[in-house]
Amino acid sequence: MEGNLLLEQFSRYKKLELEASPFHFLLDAHIELNPHQINAFCTAIDALKTGGIVLADEVGLGKTIEAGLILKHVLELGAKRVLIALPASLRKQWELELYDKFELDSIILDRPTVEKESSEWHKRLTDNTSIKIVTSYDYSSKLMKRFQDVKWDFIIIDEAHNLRNVFNGTKRAKNLYELSKGIPKILLTATPLQNSLTDLHGLISFIDQRIFGSEKV
């Protein structure tokens, strides 16, 4: 009982702290924020100044909500072009959650859609209006290659453990790694370590390869 009371008091304290901060607009989200989500948000926005962060909460602790909070923040700061790369099966789920929880419109893109109106999509991605693209890992790389003059402001990679073998795995991971260099990003995964520490090395390298250096280190 005491533990629950302390948790409630801490939660109220963190909410009051948020209300008095420059991030008060986040309280408009249609969700009840937990203290660990607010802490993750505050840590992440600081980490974005140096490249980004890997959010590795366990399943069910709300990594998607944390990502939505961070996305709201970067949009508030003026980000225009956002790319959300994930398994194809999660595209619709992300589109719905961004709208239902944060009132953020997003667009699911795939190859047939872009091929049909390539010049129109190029225009939409290069003008000064906000656009949030949800797409698969594979097509995210193809999209970035196709429109190389598009300057992405922010990238979210969900289920990022699928890309852990960036230096000795599939071209999918390597391509996204190379194309996303220098772009602020967050990686979401519940399993940052699946086999060995090299898994973590691969994920961290998406943020900054200098942190761990080579795999041998």
Labelled PLM ranges:
Residues 151-153, 199-202:
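A short beta-strand element within the Helicase C-terminal
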Residues 200-213:
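A short helix-turn-beta junction within AAA+ P-loop NTPase domains corresponding to the substrate/partner-engaging
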Residues 52-56, 83, 186:
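Short hydrophobic/aromatic beta-strand immediately N-terminal to the Walker A/P-loop
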Residues 44, 58, 70-74, 94, ...:
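Hydrophobic residues on the short alpha-helix immediately C-terminal to a glycine-rich phosphate/catalytic loop
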Residues 2-42, 63-66, 75-172, 181-182, ...:
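SF2 helicase/translocase NTPase motor core
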Residues 183-196:
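Conserved helicase ATPase motor motifs in RecA-like P-loop NTPase domains
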Residues 47:
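Phosphate/ATP-binding catalytic cores across multiple sugar-kinase/actin-like superfamilies
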Residues 50-70, 160:
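Walker A/P-loop
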